[in-house]
């Protein structure tokens, strides 16, 4: 029997640190539900002390997960951080506190301003302190990839002696070469007393494009947990992509003496879900889940694949959920058919909620002959984005053309239910719509990025607009909107981004 490799997903914590990829609690719960469906072993749900939103996310995901997986909260090696994480994790049946500090010379000297001896003592203390609350404590040695190996051994020994159940060896800056990183893991396995009773974890970044290779090299040398994100989301160039390491282990299980429990046909759905929620598009040539991952344009390749798929494909698309049958719904479809299909897509609703969903489905079905999975997912996610809406776009009319001045008339409701009807002109229909919104909302953001794509099929496809706006403090907020009318989609996206900006400000104020 091959070794079980634990998959630790940090999409909701490290992945969310990608600029513009922030998610609210409701969106995190949708992603967490998909991670549970996929069978990941650990969900790192957030950094509880960082904000009330992260605290609530850890609480709610802990409640959602039940016995299905471990739920983890991140902390610094600071007592108050650990106290806060422990409080958030009270809802989890399988809680884990993830605590630690930097261990490289630059971190000790320039960031923490401590000596090596003080670092070792802090490592020992933070693990011991966390063990007062939970049995499962993971220690991270930040920037281990650039640390002195003998010193790293001392730090990890202190964490193991203090009772750590997992020790995380991050290549925080993506600096290491795979073989050298693997040697670090083997050195720890050979020199830390008692480490055979502890899981070694690897957390690698993609700054030099080697995150997956680094993680697999860690597995070859004794690591039994990989920390990763859907689509490789993460700071700077991102983290190890979950879909890549999982499929690499599946394809080379015997060579690596390893397997995972991830349900691989859920990978593509997870990728699309995270992409849509965060507004971070997946590059077409992305391994495993990109639009071109199973596409063949060369005549020679096409001929080969038609004769036998394995001539140019090492993975069956169905193994990652890239192919399969679907139920196509229409205005004639009843409650049962819609509820069944939404359940298969991972969405469940209470009866009173489902009535609203069904009514929205009928609105779409009246505009389209056939409603596909992409329509349903867009519909549900748009509804989730509106859960805590401060401003809601109720109606929009736009007139433009040569020689007309583009004019937008918008009806917008605020959180008190007051309806505002405003009119504005602009350089184009979208600009006019945005200026109309600005007449009502209490804040303003500068448009930094605008993108549009068809997320369903046909000439009557639903178009989704993603915008990123920059607030006065320089922070970027993402908004998304979907509609058959692209101008309406644009206005919805802008309002969504404004709502996020206001919600974030209120969260920081504890409101």
Per-range role (PLM):
Residues 5-7, 17-42, 56-66, 79-200, ...:
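Alpha/beta enzyme core
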Residues 14, 18-19, 47-52, 104-106, ...:
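Short, small-residue-enriched loops and turns at beta-alpha junctions
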Residues 68, 170-172, 227-235, 247-260, ...:
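Short beta-alpha connecting loops at secondary-structure transitions
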Residues 408-412, 455-478:
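Positively charged, aromatic-enriched nucleic acid-contacting surfaces
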